């Protein structure tokens, strides 16, 4: 029995519950004790992002983030707790000091540190995080690397930053033959000036100003429809690669292959030597095209390909894609006979206009999409810079940027059609960068500077070639070219510039470069530039790219491809996912890194030493897996036929390694646990 004492709220203070019996009852229920009071929340600190070391006396590559937790859950109402960090005594190197701001105030329960570092190199460092009245937390152990020797470079790789898929179609080449070097490419293209007037029904084509403006059968293929394109197309697709075919949109294609010189020597040559190339047939397609009529139908070409290769336009890894002609901004000179110049002594046709290009693109792209909506359409296939900005001074340019106009018009065309017509913005890029030289080119008026695309290996040309890839992206680099001097008045930053136009005018459009070349085909400088370009294409998110060869011996350019696609001679390849990779000196050395989406235990790093002296590289890696070994493949000027050579493995400790890069070399490292 409980004795109840009624005194000034004593019952409540004692936490007792009293039950009284009701009227007529025999006694009452025994009083029950009240529930225990709710304990105050237990607050703890939790290291949400572990610190990742870098080089001594530098800020951490990854700064720590600490959560203030209440009963195991981040307290998002906490905007006041001050978290203090200190080195755990006895860890790391004796005498080391923690540098930077050692306090951080929580915001929504999260305290983020921004500039911490440690003064001395060492291993096993730990940090302790404390706050008044809150259970503290300790970080995982981490390492701090010694700085590289003076004048050397450091690379930092972080698989948690800038992570995105690499398009498989950036490793391409025009007219690729899978049976010879370079192996294991991913895209081929049937393009070039010859395709502008290519008759897919008969394989006749016109050389334009490349060779006397004559009609001939230079492309081969006999009388089989698409015979000139078929062997390369089928070889590429059998090798697992995609294929870009060209749909002519100039309005005429060759009607014969007489090979008798300039077609302008034939009276009424347009009607006699050419057939009208029409976007739409307007009637049922034929399994075999009619070669006796006056027309060649381009939608029937797409139907022919679709029937010959079912599902190819929608294939994931080896699709068919369609380029809308080739360099239409140069038709007036490359195919002057089809642009109104009937004089065999001149090459001065009429330049296509902005409006004409939009209309032709709309007509032919919509015709192709009506046959197969899955077909990827690439356009406008500009030849280069002046074509991109003014369409080679088209009569209706009116100081408007051509690509801005083109993209905006294609967006409107999509609205009208109810679906996309152009999927990929396609341009060509032959750099105009020049280096100091004694110019051997008799057709070049500049006798003291050489364009890097020629096969010159004088020191100034080589130096310019090695730096030229930076104009694809680097806002701090200005090349020596007429573009940088008179058009951009500074850095070109080609890829960010083009992506910015897409974002502003037609979001969702992809980007390709279906012809490019940096010269030095059989020189180590060509390999360095090619490898650099492939790394940039992957990092910057390009959709597709195909090299156009300018020389007969391309061994070192092929070597540049090998370092990404066949470094071990067994199709060893760069990963499918790009991650952050930074260099301390972009002029001397660049670095690109990848992981595999399906395999965290493999990381591939490509290191490019552009310096004429050997460079010792310190490589620090942030990754979820601890690596222990790096397989090494190397390309130098001494590499036979520009082929990579395997080197002894290098040990990796605490995800850090030192590697001595030979002068002017490309090194591919394959890291594994």
Language-model segment annotations:
Residues 18-19:
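C-terminal motif of bacterial Sec signal peptides marking the signal peptidase cleavage site
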Residues 27-148:
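Core sequence-specific DNA-binding domains of diverse transcription factors
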Residues 156-296, 300, 323, 328-352:
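N-terminal substrate-binding region of glycoside hydrolase catalytic domains
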Residues 165, 170-172, 242-244, 319-323, ...:
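Structural preference for beta-strand elements that scaffold enzyme active sites
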Residues 296-309, 328, 335-525, 530:
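Noncatalytic carbohydrate-binding groove/subsite architecture in carbohydrate-active enzymes
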Residues 523, 534-604, 641:
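Glycan-recognition and catalytic regions of carbohydrate-active enzymes
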Residues 586-626, 667:
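Carbohydrate-binding surface patches
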Residues 650-673:
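C-terminal beta-strand-rich structural cap/linker in extracellular carbohydrate-active enzymes
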């Amino acid at each position: 029995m409980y004795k109840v004492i009624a005194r000034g709220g004593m019952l409540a203070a004692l936490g007792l519950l009293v039950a009284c019996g009701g009227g007529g009852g025999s006694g009452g229920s025994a009083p029950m004790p009240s529930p225990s009071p709710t304990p105050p929340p237990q607050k703890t600190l939790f290291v949400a992002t572990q610190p990742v070391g870098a080089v001594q006396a530098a800020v951490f590559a990854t700064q720590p983030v600490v959560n203030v937790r209440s009963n195991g859950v981040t307290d998002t109402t906490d905007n006041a707790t001050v978290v203090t960090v200190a080195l755990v005594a006895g860890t790391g190197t004796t005498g080391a000091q923690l540098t930077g701001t050692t306090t951080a105030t929580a915001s929504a329960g999260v305290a983020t540190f921004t500039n911490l570092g440690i003064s001395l190199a060492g291993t096993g460092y730990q940090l302790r995080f404390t706050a008044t009245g809150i259970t503290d937390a300790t970080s995982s152990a981490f390492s701090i690397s010694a700085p590289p020797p003076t004048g050397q470079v450091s690379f930092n790789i972080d698989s948690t930053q800038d992570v995105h898929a690499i398009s498989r179609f950036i490793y391409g080449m025009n007219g690729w033959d899978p049976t010879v070097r370079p192996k294991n490419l991913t895209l081929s293209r049937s393009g070039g000036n010859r395709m502008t007037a290519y008759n897919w029904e008969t394989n006749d084509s016109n050389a334009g100003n490349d060779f006397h403006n004559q009609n001939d059968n230079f492309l081969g293929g006999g009388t089989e429809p698409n015979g000139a394109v078929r062997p390369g197309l089928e070889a590429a697709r059998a090798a697992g690669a995609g294929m870009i075919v060209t749909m002519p949109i100039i309005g005429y294609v060759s009607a014969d292959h007489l090979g008798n010189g300039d077609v302008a020597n034939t009276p009424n040559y347009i009607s006699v030597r050419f057939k009208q190339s029409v976007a739409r047939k307007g009637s049922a397609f034929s399994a075999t095209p009619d070669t006796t009529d006056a027309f060649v139908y381009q939608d029937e070409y797409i139907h022919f390909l679709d029937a010959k290769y079912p599902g190819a336009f929608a294939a994931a890894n080896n699709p068919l894609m369609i380029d809308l002609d080739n360099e239409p901004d140069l038709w007036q000179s490359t195919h002057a006979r089809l642009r109104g110049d009937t004089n065999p002594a001149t090459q001065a046709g009429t330049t296509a206009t902005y409006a004409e290009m939009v209309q032709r693109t709309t007509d032919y792209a919509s015709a192709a999409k009506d046959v197969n909506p899955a077909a990827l359409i690439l356009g406008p296939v500009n030849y280069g810079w002046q074509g991109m900005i003014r369409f080679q001074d088209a009569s209706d340019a009116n100081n408007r940027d051509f690509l801005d106009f083109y993209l905006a018009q294609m967006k409107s065309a999509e609205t009208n059609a109810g679906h996309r017509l152009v999927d990929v913005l396609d341009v060509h890029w032959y750099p105009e960068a020049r280096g100091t030289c004694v110019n051997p080119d008799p057709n070049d008026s500049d006798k003291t500077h050489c364009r890097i695309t020629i096969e010159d290996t004088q020191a100034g040309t080589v130096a310019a070639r090695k730096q030229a890839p930076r104009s694809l992206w680097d806002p701090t680099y200005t090349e020596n070219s007429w573009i940088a001097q008179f058009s951009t008045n500074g850095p070109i930053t080609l890829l960010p510039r083009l992506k910015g136009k897409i974002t502003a005018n037609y979001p969702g459009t992809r980007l390709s470069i279906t012809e490019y070349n940096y010269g030095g085909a059989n020189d180590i400088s060509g390999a360095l530039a090619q490898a650099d370009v492939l790394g940039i294409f992957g990092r910057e998110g390009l959709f597709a790219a195909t090299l156009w060869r300018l020389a007969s011996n391309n061994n070192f350019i092929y070597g540049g491809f090998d370092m990404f696609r066949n470094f071990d001679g067994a199709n060893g390849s760069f990963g499918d996912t790009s991650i952050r990779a930074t260099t301390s000196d972009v002029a001397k050395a660049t670095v690109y890194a990848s992981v595999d989406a399906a395999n965290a235990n493999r990381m591939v790093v490509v290191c490019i030493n552009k310096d004429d002296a050997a460079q010792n590289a310190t490589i620090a890696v942030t990754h979820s897996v601890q690596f222990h070994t790096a397989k090494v493949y190397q390309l130098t000027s001494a590499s036979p036929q520009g082929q990579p050579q395997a080197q002894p493995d290098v040990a990796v400790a605490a995800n850090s390694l030192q590697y001595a890069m030979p002068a002017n070399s490309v090194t591919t490292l394959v890291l594994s646990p």
